[in-house]
């Protein structure tokens, strides 16, 4: 990723502050779905149960209008802010996944109407690039940075198009091809245009360079050699496009694909998959009960490549004192400056550090896209099935989260800031491209990424998600204090817009169909 795009990826907590227009949502009583450590799942968490019903009630009472009016009409259309697309995915991908699991066709059609309304904002791609793109012309990031203004912000496009492609793929077996304003055909065509534009000789050369790179090749703070979420999202788009094409054999011709263009896509997809494979580190841990041959496999992503990156300068510092303090100038109250209290030079880099757990939430929907479309990807692109992440590898990532990220405290669950298990400060004095001051996240400061990030859909983590559900709904003072300290998005008063958004991100991840994910 470019350094500037990395800066534009604001943490979830900061993005929630921009959800003010969701205040229309109403508070309601939450049923007590008691946490269980194994055994039968609470009936409240089944598809069709009260928790799913509450999610859709929130959606009907304010979520739909928030997307339609705030994200799309105000930010995307009026301001030209394509970060609205980024936030739409962050806030509502878990909702979409629940709608698909529970087979809510009408809800998916409702989401499709919202997504389709963004297609009118596509414009000719900048310069001599082919196809259409969402061009960022306003909003905090693109107004503040001349480097982003009037460009396609690749992060926003890949992330949103992965959401749209998943939605269209799920509907491809229900909506008849050739119908007026066919959402599936529209989305497949837009996916083709974008994938073809991103698949340049320069992009392929950069992928080959990164495939060959090793952590020791990173010499400075540059992100040039990183595996980023943009690559994961592109693979997810390829996966769901394959699902659409497999479900509708005539769709390829309708959206302008032929054998030659499919072969070109395969070459790009192969490189993307090789990069993910090269950056996946799998280890075998001894069985905790000492059983022979029963070791546990854990996996991490991009380990060691991020050790020198600016956001991770304090990753080995686990103290309570803030390394940087943001102070307002008394003479100029609008001016906030960062004052360093503890220099970063005092701390050695964490050698094996990779992604933080907030960005690693992309793995949830990335793996889901792969798993839903394995056969289709082999059928459509002719790729080697072994090039796809295996189910064992996916399980190893879940084991890593369970064994190294979680603090092993079921009564008071917290989660380390980094997927490696490192738990130092994150994003101290981070510049997100808007000139704001950020003191950073202390140890366990990204714990809210677990409930909002979708991790509870992983079978190994579901019971812990149910436990956290109980804690966030508890009226006990000790529980409320714990939530306020570590899960602030769930600590606000019922009816608060930020809390409603957090719950609409979290609760769908707990809902299962027939006891299965």
Language-model regions: role of each:
Residues 190-353:
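Active-site cradle of extracellular carbohydrate-active enzymes
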Residues 79-83, 87-90, 94-254, 412-448:
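Extended ligand-binding groove/face enriched in aromatic
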Residues 31-35:
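Sec/Tat signal peptide C-region and signal peptidase I cleavage site
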Residues 38-43, 52, 96-116, 166-192, ...:
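Structural helix-adjacent loops and short alpha-helical linkers that scaffold large soluble proteins
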Residues 36-141, 194-216, 281-301, 487-517:
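Low-complexity, Ser/Thr/Pro/Gly-enriched N-terminal "stalk/linker" regions
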Residues 1-14:
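N-terminal secretory signal peptides that target proteins for export/translocation
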Residues 18-29:
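Bacterial N-terminal signal peptides
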Residues 83, 355, 376-517:
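CBM-like carbohydrate-recognition segments
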């Amino acid at each position: 990723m470019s350094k500037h795009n990395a800066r534009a990826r604001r943490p979830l907590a900061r993005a929630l502050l921009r959800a003010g227009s969701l205040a229309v949502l109403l508070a309601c009583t939450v049923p007590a779905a008691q946490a269980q450590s194994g055994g039968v799942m609470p009936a409240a968490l089944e598809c069709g149960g009260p928790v799913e019903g509450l999610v859709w009630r929130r959606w009907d009472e304010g979520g739909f209008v928030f997307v339609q009016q705030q994200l799309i009409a105000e930010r995307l259309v009026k301001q030209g802010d394509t970060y609205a697309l980024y936030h739409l995915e962050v806030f509502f991908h878990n909702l979409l996944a629940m709608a698909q699991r529970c087979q809510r066709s009408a809800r998916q059609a409702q989401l499709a109407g919202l997504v389709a309304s963004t297609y009118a904002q596509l414009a000719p791609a900048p310069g001599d690039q082919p196809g259409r793109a969402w061009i960022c012309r306003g909003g905090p990031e693109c107004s503040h940075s001349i480097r982003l203004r009037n460009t396609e912000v690749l992060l926003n496009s890949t992330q949103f198009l992965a959401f749209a492609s998943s939605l269209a793929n799920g509907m491809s077996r229900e909506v008849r091809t050739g119908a007026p304003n066919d959402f599936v055909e529209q989305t497949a065509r837009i996916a083709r245009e974008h994938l073809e534009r991103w698949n340049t000789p320069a992009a392929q050369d950069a992928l080959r360079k990164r495939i060959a790179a090793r952590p020791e090749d990173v010499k400075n703070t540059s992100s040039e050699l990183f595996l980023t979420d943009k690559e994961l999202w592109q693979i997810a788009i390829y996966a769901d496009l394959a699902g659409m094409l497999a479900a509708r054999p005539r769709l390829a011709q309708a959206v302008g694909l032929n054998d030659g263009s499919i072969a070109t896509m395969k070459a790009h997809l192969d490189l993307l998959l090789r990069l993910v494979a090269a950056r996946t580190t799998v280890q075998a841990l001894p069985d905790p009960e000492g059983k022979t041959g029963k070791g546990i496999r854990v996996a991490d992503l991009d380990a060691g490549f991020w050790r020198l990156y600016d956001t991770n300068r304090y990753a080995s510092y686990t103290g309570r004192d803030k390394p940087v303090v943001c102070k307002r100038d008394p003479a100029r109250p609008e001016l906030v400056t960062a004052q360093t209290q503890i220099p970063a030079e005092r701390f050695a880099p964490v050698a094996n550090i990779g992604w933080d757990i907030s960005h690693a939430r992309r793995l949830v929907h990335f793996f889901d896209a792969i798993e839903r479309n394995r056969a289709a990807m082999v059928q459509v692109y002719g790729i080697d099935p072994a090039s796809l992440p295996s189910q064992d590898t996916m399980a190893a990532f879940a084991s890593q989260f369970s064994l190294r990220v979680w603090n092993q405290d079921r009564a008071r669950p917290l989660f380390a800031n980094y997927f490696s298990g490192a738990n130092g400060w994150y994003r101290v004095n981070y510049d997100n491209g808007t000139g704001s001051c950020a003191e950073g996240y202390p140890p366990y400061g990204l714990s809210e990424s677990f409930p909002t990030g979708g991790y509870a859909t992983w079978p190994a983590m579901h019971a812990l998600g149910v436990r956290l559900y109980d804690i966030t709904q508890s009226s006990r003072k000790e529980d409320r204090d714990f939530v306020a300290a570590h899960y602030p998005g769930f600590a606000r008063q019922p009816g608060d817009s930020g809390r409603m958004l957090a719950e609409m991100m979290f609760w769908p991840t707990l809902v299962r169909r027939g006891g299965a994910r």
